[in-house]
């Protein structure tokens, strides 16, 4: 049986595999849309746990959790971080075919080296392994960005946000270009 989301995930032809592995895989990433908080990049925040990484500001994940019927307390409310994570694990387990399913597992593999599919049954093991890594120096916000070879990233800020973090990032020693990109929701 083929491994779950292996190095050739989504690469179905020999040409695709050659183009990706011999060219694109080594190229720097130009991240034109993300949910990263410029303040957390500036401060080089050390995330407390996987819930803070995944559910701190991602409306796509929140929407999926709402569609699963979870209470707002388990999504953006004051519930315990582990309980929020378990709700997200159950959501992902039921999201096969949704891009969130693939994104979640790519993040687990690329950042944490975890190849076990996220589910309620595997949640505790994944939580413990990922959180142990999040407490190391290699897993600060800036190091996570740099270790993925990001050369440019554009945050999606609120039009009313103060841009002082962007200016400070441009003047800091971080070696990525970080222009502001505003996204208006109508």
Regions found by a protein language model. Name each.
Residues 174-186:
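Single conserved hydrophobic/aromatic residue that forms the stacking wall/gate
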Residues 35, 157-158, 181:
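Active-site beta-loop-alpha junctions enriched in small/polar residues
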Residues 47-170:
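Alpha-helical scaffold segments that flank or form the walls of functional sites
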